[in-house]
């Protein structure tokens, strides 16, 4: 997958759907400048956790819906690490390892 796929987001779509200007969205998110919104919309800047939560609260949509490319990138990275950890734990029979293996298998299957 190309990097442009991972940088795709719908922040501008959500903002425009609700008739907000970049300046108005910046205000709602507690920012001083509309240029910050522009950078997020063009993925020149990645949202930190608080920003992502504010955007979710504002539009009542999950980060994965608003930032699907970024979400997919995170999903792939987690799945890749889950595969490595699964191989490390494979063969262990203690209950905690079995629980972890079940979670890791689920993560790998859904990726």
List where the protein language model places each region.
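A short, Lys/Arg-rich alpha-helix, primarily the initiator
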Residues: 1-18, 103-109
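Short basic helix-loop element that most often maps to the first helix and adjoining turn
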Residues: 9-28, 79-92
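Residues in the recognition helix of alpha-helical DNA-binding motifs
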Residues: 14, 28, 39-40, 69
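The short coil/loop that forms the "turn" connecting the two helices of the helix-turn-helix
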Residues: 20, 31-32, 61
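Recognition helix of helix-turn-helix/homeodomain-like DNA-binding domains
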Residues: 30-47
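Short, solvent-exposed alpha-helical "recognition" segments
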Residues: 44-49, 75-77
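DNA major-groove recognition helix of helix-turn-helix/homeodomain DNA-binding modules
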Residues: 50-65
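Short, charged recognition helix plus adjacent turn
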Residues: 67-111
């Amino acid at each position: 997958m190309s990097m442009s796929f991972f940088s795709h987001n719908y922040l501008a779509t959500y903002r425009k759907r609700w008739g907000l200007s970049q300046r108005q969205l910046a205000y709602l998110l507690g920012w001083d400048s509309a240029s910050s919104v522009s950078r997020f919309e063009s993925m020149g800047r990645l949202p930190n956790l608080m920003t992502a939560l504010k955007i979710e609260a504002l539009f009542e949509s999950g980060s994965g819906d608003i930032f699907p490319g970024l979400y997919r990138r995170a999903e792939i990275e987690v799945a890749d690490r889950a595969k490595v950890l699964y191989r490390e734990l494979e063969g262990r029979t203690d209950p905690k390892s079995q629980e972890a293996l079940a979670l890791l298998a689920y993560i790998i299957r859904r990726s």
